[in-house]
């Protein structure tokens, strides 16, 4: 069968891998795996356009939105997609068709991205800024649905040992889009107009719509939920002083030491996620290239995805714990080396240095991202996996706001101080990661 041959080409596996899946899911591993690759790749490709670190700040500037609005982009995008997940979890667990949750989330992202395109094409100034921020908030909420559902569906339809590779393949596919976009922006340079940005956003919206259609065709196993437990979680607990999901989240943090250490390690891994914008900011201070360098940074991110996607996917399947540790240390080392080179007369002014550092950090962040995604899928089973993902992401949303506030305060004194703090957090993350058990 062509489907099986293509899957065998993309994913290394053995027949014994499927023993951890239900018998109903085993005949459809290849088809389900390819459908998830395609849908996730389309979503990731759209992310390259709706990028709160690069493209959206450029759009804000082009529309004449107040500069202060740019500072809200990353917190809204990241925290907005994480904070609601513990509240969503009981409702997701109560559903038998969990792929429908992903489809709904993808549809919501398509609508929000189309709204951004409409704003870009029709209004300017502070009205445009408010419109983009509101659309981004809706986008982030919809993204929280796809995030919580995707790992549950992946865990129920694809065996352990293949999940990291699937995520790696989707990363490579989306990276090709990033390279294409980066080359295009680099070619257009400073002449890129708002109309082109609006068209790019409209195209990105269609990617999410197509991804939703593909994901809807995934064949799920017959036993999808533990209905009694899920229903009780979602509908009962009316006598408690606080909502049921808050009680569950607090209990999970209190009683599960492995989960607690994983969240701590993941929180400290923010070094690879939060440091690139400060590298970009330092580069703008150095030579004043401004927006003309956007394509180069997007290109660097895309090349990193092409190089690291499948490699890190296989490393995550081999040991997601060791990959988390290595990525954390590599990010910290990269920051220290970069700041050291900037202190050397002549070396710190090299035009290639910021893009090279951005490339390395993007590569390292890819490894950290695949590692923690694979680890949380492998560490739990069934509805416990859904709860792990939801509570971890909600806690990460809180941590992101806290660390973001601290680094923003340090950046007021100098971007280098923020980078030094993030480098220290990365070292601490590696130490905590060593205490995690192997799950591969």
Locations of regions flagged by a protein language model:
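Helix-loop boundary and gating motifs at the non-cytosolic
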Residues: 2-83, 258-298
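Multi-pass alpha-helical transporter architecture, strongest
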Residues: 6, 117-120, 207-219, 338, ...
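Short hydrophobic/alpha-helical segments at membrane-entry points of transmembrane helices
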Residues: 36, 127-135, 261-262, 349-358
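Cytoplasmic membrane-interface "Motif A"-like loop-to-helix N-cap segments
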Residues: 93-107, 317-331
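C-terminal ends and interior cores of transmembrane alpha-helices
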Residues: 106-125, 330-347
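Flexible cytoplasmic inter-helical loops of multi-pass small-molecule transporters
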Residues: 219-248
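C-terminal transmembrane helical hairpin of 12-TM major facilitator-type secondary transporters
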Residues: 322-368
């Amino acid at each position: 069968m062509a489907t099986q041959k293509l899957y065998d080409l993309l994913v290394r596996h053995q027949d014994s891998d499927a023993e951890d899946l239900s018998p109903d899911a085993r005949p459809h591993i290849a088809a389900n795996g390819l459908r998830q690759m395609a849908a996730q790749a389309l979503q990731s490709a759209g992310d390259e356009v709706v990028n709160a670190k690069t493209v959206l700040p450029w759009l804000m500037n082009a529309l004449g939105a107040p500069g202060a609005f740019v500072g809200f982009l990353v917190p809204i995008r990241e925290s907005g997609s994480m904070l609601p997940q513990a509240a969503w979890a009981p409702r997701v667990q109560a559903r038998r068709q969990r792929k429908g949750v992903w489809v709904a989330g993808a549809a919501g992202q398509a609508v929000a991205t189309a709204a951004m395109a409409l704003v870009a094409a029709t209004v300017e100034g502070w009205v445009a800024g408010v419109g983009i921020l509101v659309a981004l908030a809706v986008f982030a909420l919809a993204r929280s649905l796809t995030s919580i559902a995707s790992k549950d569906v992946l865990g129920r339809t694809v065996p352990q040992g293949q999940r990291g590779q699937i995520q790696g393949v989707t990363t490579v596919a989306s990276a090709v889009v990033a390279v294409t976009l980066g080359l295009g922006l680099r070619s257009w340079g400073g002449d890129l107009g708002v109309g082109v940005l609006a068209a790019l956003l409209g195209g990105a919206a269609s990617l999410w719509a197509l991804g939703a259609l593909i994901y809807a065709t995934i064949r799920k196993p017959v036993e999808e939920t533990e209905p009694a437990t899920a229903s009780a979680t979602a509908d009962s607990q009316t006598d408690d002083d606080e909502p049921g999901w808050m009680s569950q989240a607090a209990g999970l943090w209190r009683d599960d030491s492995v989960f607690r250490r994983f969240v701590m390690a993941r929180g400290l891994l923010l070094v690879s996620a939060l440091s690139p914008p400060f590298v970009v900011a330092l580069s703008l201070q150095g030579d004043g290239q401004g927006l003309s360098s956007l394509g180069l940074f997007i290109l660097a991110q895309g090349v990193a995805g092409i190089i690291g996607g499948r490699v890190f996917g296989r490393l995550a399947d081999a040991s997601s714990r060791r990959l988390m540790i290595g990525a954390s240390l590599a990010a910290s080392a990269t920051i220290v080396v970069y700041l050291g080179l900037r202190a050397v007369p002549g070396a710190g002014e090299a035009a290639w240095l910021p893009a090279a550092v951005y490339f390395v950090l993007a590569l390292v962040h890819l490894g950290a991202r695949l590692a923690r995604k694979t680890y949380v899928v492998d560490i739990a089973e069934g509805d416990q996996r859904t709860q792990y993902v939801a509570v971890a992401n909600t806690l990460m949303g809180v941590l992101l706001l806290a660390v973001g506030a601290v680094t923003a305060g340090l950046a007021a004194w100098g971007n280098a101080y923020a980078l030094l703090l993030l480098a220290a957090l990365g070292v601490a993350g590696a130490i905590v990661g060593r205490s995690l058990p192997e799950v591969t």
